[in-house]
Amino acid sequence: MSQTATILVIDDEPQIRKFLRISLASQGYKVIEAGTGNEGLAQAALSKPDLLVLDLGLPDMDGQQVLREFREWSTVPVLVLSVRASEGQKVEALDGGANDYVTKPFGIQEFLARVRALLRQAPVGEAQEAALQFGSLTVDL
C-alpha cells in the first residue's frame, strides 16, 4: 500500500469499534471512529475517508438513513457491518448504496479481505470531495 487508507467506523458498540480499530490498524490503516449516525456523517465530511464501515443499528438514526445521506455527496465505498441478517435487509442496504454487507458475528479475516477488495476498487486518496450543490450554489464540506 503506497498510501495509508483512512477507514471510518460508525458503530454504537465500543467493543466492536475497539476490535475493528486494533484489527485495521494492525494492517496499516488509519482508523477514525464514530458512535452515532450524526457524528459519523460529520466525521465523514471532515476526514474524507477512503472507506466507510457502517452499522445499521445506531442510537440516533437508522444506518439506512446514514447511508442515504452519505450517498447524497459521496461515492466512497461503504461496507455495512450489521446483526440484521435477513435477505430483505441486506438487499435494502445494497440497493441503498452499500458496496458490501457483512453480518455480525463475523470472521476478521473475511472482513479484512472485503476491506482490501473495496479499497482496490476505489484507490486510496481518490475519495470524492465532499460538496453539496443547490442550483448554482456549491458548498464545499
Feature roles, as predicted:
Residues 47-53, 58:
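Active-site beta3 strand of CheY-like receiver
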Residues 18-26:
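Charged docking surfaces used in two-component/phosphorelay signaling
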Residues 17, 59, 86, 104:
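The feature encodes the CheY-like receiver
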Residues 45-47, 69-76, 96:
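Conserved phosphotransfer cores of two-component systems
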Residues 28-36, 43:
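Short hydrophobic/Thr-rich beta-strand motif most characteristic of the beta2 strand and flanking loop
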Residues 36-39, 62-65, 70, 89:
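Acidic catalytic/metal-coordinating carboxylates
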Residues 3-8, 117-141:
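Short, Lys/Arg-enriched segments at the junction into DNA-binding effector domains
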